[in-house]
Amino acid sequence: MTAFKRIFSPALLVLALYGGAAHAALVPPQGYYEGIEKIKTSDGNFRCESAPKPFTGALQFRSKYEGSDKARATLNRDSEQAFRDSTKDITTLERGVAKMVNQYMRDGRPAQLDCTLTWLGTWARADALMSTNYNHTGKSMRKWALGSMSGSWLRLKFSNSQPLAAHQAEAELIEKWFARLAEQTVRDWSNLPLEKINNHSYWAAWSVMATAVATDRRDLFDWAVKEYKVGANQIDDQGFLPNEIKRKQRALAYHNYALPPLAMIASFAKANGVDLRSENNFALQRLGEGVLYGARDPRHFAERAGEKQDMKDLKVDGKYAWLEPWCALYQCVGDTLERKHRMQPFDSFRLGGNLTRVYDPSAQSKK
């Protein structure tokens, strides 16, 4: 051995060790490792419905705010119905997968898992939702659906019960489809001007983050973190998002809607050694506190947005599902913790199902 090798081999060994750590497999937060709650031996009258028809057409959908002014805050009932009709198969898939994964993680019935895999496998084989002929509403549906599916999938993939161990070929097929959808989502939502980056971009980043962990793709993870930082740095000193304030009477509702994807991204990043909590002087914490205060007294939002706030969505407990990852990040206490416990359990199909089971299982068991 030469002197050069004798001197530098230990250093190279250390570099190799640390280099491996730097590229460790991506993981979800701890709660995703939970096993099946209690395996049931009966069939529970579970019936696997036929999978919704894979959507392979152009992602051209009417917006429910069609005809609204630039605030995009006035609902158009006719176009909303047209939107729901044309996207029915997609939302049926999203809701159905989240529901079946919830059921399987609770009961462990093989039929529940088989049905989930059949639905996802059917859409994966059709390469559904991959059209590059889309409008804004269409690309929005793509990323919402991806976040729903990947978010649910994570509970199967990382569960200590290892439900996918006997289904590796099908799992690989589905995950490759998720990865293709994520790559297209990155193309859909990259390089937007700052004035166009709003809650849609945050939801796109959440879908890519969930898929990054499901498929162990560091490039997708890095993109989601980058998009998170853009969002966090849009939050001003008072906890407002300027591009959501533009929504006038729905400004507070859209601030609340921006929180779930941001909180989930920060939670997943932290699980992988990237601590985003303090980004832009703890902007995510500031945003959450502002929304919680605004839900009780919306005057500050009304003053900033210039209109009285529509509080309909703020009265729905399920709209606060972001409290689960957010409280895990910032250690909620006192009144905020009480509000969270009062509203639990949180079940959001767009975030992959039952978040209380993932983030606060002791509370889930009391329900």
From Swiss-Prot:
It is an enzyme of class 4 (lyase). Its EC number is 4.2.2.3. Catalyzes the depolymerization of alginate by cleaving the beta-1,4 glycosidic bond between two adjacent sugar residues via a beta-elimination mechanism. May serve to degrade mislocalized alginate that is trapped in the periplasmic space. It is found in: Periplasm. One of its GO terms (cellular component) is periplasmic space. GO terms for biological process: alginic acid catabolic process. It catalyses: Eliminative cleavage of alginate to give oligosaccharides with 4-deoxy-alpha-L-erythro-hex-4-enuronosyl groups at their non-reducing ends and beta-D-mannuronate at their reducing end. This is Alginate lyase. It comes from Pseudomonas putida (strain W619). Keywords: Lyase, Periplasm, Signal. Belongs to the polysaccharide lyase 5 family. The lineage of its organism: Bacteria, Pseudomonadati, Pseudomonadota, Gammaproteobacteria, Pseudomonadales. Residues 1-24 form the signal peptide. InterPro entries: Alginate_lyase (IPR022859), Alginate_lyase_dom (IPR008397), Chondroitin_lyas (IPR008929). GO terms for molecular function: poly(beta-D-mannuronate) lyase activity. HAMAP family: Alginate_lyase. Substrate binds at residues 63-64, 136-137, 254. SUPFAM superfamilies: Chondroitin AC/alginate lyase.
